Amino acid sequence: MQNRNTYDLKKKMTRLISVLVMIHIITRTSISNAYPIFAQQGYENPREATGRIVCANCHLAKKPVDIEGPQSVLPNTVFEAVVKIPYDTQMKQVLANGKKGALNVGAVLILPEGFELAPPDRISPEIRQKMGNLYFQNYRPNQKNIIVIGPVPGQKYSELVFPILSPDPATDKEAHFLKYPIYLGGNRGRGQIYPDGSKSNNTVYSASATGRVSKILRKEKGGYEITIDNTSDGGQVVDIVPPGPELLISEGELIKVDQPLTNNPNVGGFGQGDAEIVLQDPLRVKGLLLFLASVILAQIFLVLKKKQFEKVQLAEMNL
C-alpha cells in the first residue's frame, strides 16, 4: 500500500513538473517573440507602399530612432549598422499584469536586396563584443534582407549593433554598384493595440456612452467595471478597464461619450528612420586613387619645374 502511494505521488510530481516546464517554455517563447511575431504573422512585408512600417499600427506614440553606418562599403564585406533607440531608462511601463516594469526595445531593419545578416564565422571579435548576446532573425526565411530583433532589455540594449554582409555583384547578378536606401523601425515599450484590433492595458480607456457614473467596481485581480447610467436611452452601460491604467473619474460624476476614463500609461513609442549606403566598385576606388596620385605627382612636377625655371632666370640676370 505504501509503495502504491509513493508511486502515485511520484507520478503526480512528474506531471506537475512537466506542466510547469511547458508553461515556462510557452510563456518564454511568447514574450521573446512578442514584438516581431505580431508583424510577421499579420503582414507579408513590414513596410507598406506608403513607406509606413507596420509596427506603427500597434505602437501609436511617436518617438525618435536613429541609425548609423558607413556611407559606402565594398562587396562581400561585413560592416556594422548601429540602431539607437533613446529613452529615459528610469521610466517604468505597465506590464500585461498591470504591474510596473522596465521597458524592452525591438527593431526591424530593412536592407537592400542582397544585403543580409552576416554569418557567425564572418563576424569579427570587435563587432561580436559590441553585439553582446543579441539574437537576430529574418522577417521571413526567404527575406534575408529584412532583420528583426526584440524584445530585449532596453537598459542594456538601447543601442543595437547589426552585423551586415554586403553582396558581391561578381557572384550575385541581382546586385549592382549603386546607392541604396536602408529603412529602420524601432520601438521602446509595449504597444497600445493588438493585431486583432483590441486594446492592450497600455493605453487610455474612454467612456462608451454619455451619462452619470453610478458605480465603480474594483475587480479582485485588478481593473475596474464602470457602470454608466445612459442619459440618451435610460439604460446602463458597463465599461471594463483592465489592470494598469489609473482612473480619472469617480462615482456620481457626469461624463460624455469618448471622455477619458483613465490616464494614458504609455511611456514608450515607435519611430522610423532611414539611411543611404553605396555599394562601391573596387575598380572605381582604385581608379580614383590612381587619379589622385597622378594629380599629386603633377603638382609636385609643376613645383619642381617652376623652381628650375626660376633658377634659370636668376642665372640669366646675373650674366
Swiss-Prot record:
Instruction: Tell me which PROSITE patterns the record gives.
Output: CYTF
The reply to whether Plastid figures as a keyword in the UniProt entry is yes
Where is it mostly found?
plastid
Q: What is its membrane topology?
A: Single-pass membrane protein
Q: Which cofactor does it need?
A: heme
Subcellular localization(s) per the UniProt record: Plastid, Chloroplast thylakoid membrane
* Pfam family, any one: Apocytochr_F_N
Give Gene Ontology CC terms: chloroplast thylakoid membrane
What residue intervals traverse the membrane?
285-304
One function term, GO molecular function aspect: electron transfer activity
Residues annotated to bind heme: Y35, C55, C58, H59
Q: How is the cofactor bound?
A: Binds 1 heme group covalently.
Q: Which UniProt keywords are given for this protein, alphabetically ordered?
A: Chloroplast, Electron transport, Heme, Iron, Membrane, Metal-binding, Photosynthesis, Plastid, Signal, Thylakoid, Transmembrane, Transmembrane helix, Transport
Regarding protein family, the annotation reads: Belongs to the cytochrome f family.
- Please describe the quaternary structure of this protein: The 4 large subunits of the cytochrome b6-f complex are cytochrome b6, subunit IV (17 kDa polypeptide, petD), cytochrome f and the Rieske protein, while the 4 small subunits are PetG, PetL, PetM and PetN. The complex functions as a dimer.
List, alphabetically, the HAMAP family matched.
Answer: Cytb6_f_cytF
Q: What is this protein called?
A: Cytochrome f
Q: What is the lineage of its organism?
A: Eukaryota, Viridiplantae, Streptophyta, Embryophyta, Tracheophyta
